[in-house]
């Protein structure tokens, strides 16, 4: 039987257990001492800001190191094209699933809420910002930074990714003459990852602060309001993860449950902070540790964070149909097709917009004349809870995408991946912060560090 001393020792070595404890204490504090708990919000916000502080540098280091040592630049382009095609297919499936579930269940039907009963003030906060969502040409132009420094200063990951791909490609083409620069960036990445390891140690504190504030602010029973929407959303996300993503992962030779268990610490942090940004560096590191080439991880994950938003896609069509039903708006087949087509465009505009979920939802409602935009206020009270599901599903979707594309490209050491997922090889050290390296030939060599 485990003694208290043994349990404390085990907790001191496990970030996973520390995060669980932080989450539980956060709930207790939120229920028992709400006045104090609401003041804990800066702990969660501060943790996320510390993580975001390094994301651009980590993306730069991982992508440059991966591409400069990849050898074949045509392969890099091929991975990028396959990623975009994969993202479009999976997000379309997610959009259709949300639409079909909400419509077939009649989600929100019978509420008969009148538009004059809805407060317009909160809606204006989001509808007034829909101009931030640009068309395709403006979006593509927005990928080009004003300067290299502005991309890093504004933490615009897509702009950083573009520069990183160009920089890594140039290093690759220059070859031996630039070997000193390549070594310098590789050594710099060790420093960045060491800092990240120090920050990750603060995850339990960040989760505690975020959960304590949320419990005190919204209450344990706050899900009862608009509970059907929240429950159906989570059920739909679960079906998507286990059935759709599970099937995709199975085709790659990996089972979903061991895969989720491997990322359990990251999923817990996302659950506590409602932000998948908080775990991006750790996720990239673990995917490399599984045996996936660093250049593939460095291309797929940052791009997926903007284009492969499966959880957000489910939320978008589900919420639009819900708002139509609760406001008594009849939906014809042409309306459903319009919702789907509009969502295919607006769902790609979420990158870099604060409060993006509600802003994109407002933009979608604005583009579908049949549905009143004022209905947006109906989902405001539960948006934070749905945000947890969005972030979890988005994260899992991007991890699955990386494995799938790596499998297509033969960029994953499958025996190593299976050994790690089965527990025959250890996961990377919990917070040592060291970047992982892999040989340039897919399927050969081992991970080090």
Curated annotation (Swiss-Prot):
GO terms for biological process: L-aspartate transmembrane transport. The chain crosses the membrane at residues 16-38, 53-71, 84-106, 157-176, 197-219, 229-251, 311-333, 358-380. It comes from the Bacteria. One of its GO terms (cellular component) is plasma membrane. The lineage of its organism: Bacteria, Pseudomonadati, Pseudomonadota, Gammaproteobacteria, Pseudomonadales. Gene3D superfamilies: Sodium:dicarboxylate symporter. It is found in: Cell inner membrane. Responsible for the transport of dicarboxylates such as succinate, fumarate, and malate from the periplasm across the membrane. It is a multi-pass membrane protein. Disulfide bonds: none annotated. One of its GO terms (molecular function) is malate:proton symporter activity. Belongs to the dicarboxylate/amino acid:cation symporter (DAACS) (TC 2.A.23) family. Its main location: membrane. InterPro entries: C4_dicarb_transport (IPR023954), Na-dicarboxylate_symporter (IPR001991), Na-dicarboxylate_symporter_CS (IPR018107), Na:dicarbo_symporter_sf (IPR036458). Keywords: Cell inner membrane, Cell membrane, Membrane, Symport, Transmembrane, Transmembrane helix, Transport. The gene is dctA1. It comes from Pseudomonas aeruginosa (strain ATCC 15692 / DSM 22644 / CIP 104116 / JCM 14847 / LMG 12228 / 1C / PRS 101 / PAO1). This is C4-dicarboxylate transport protein 1.
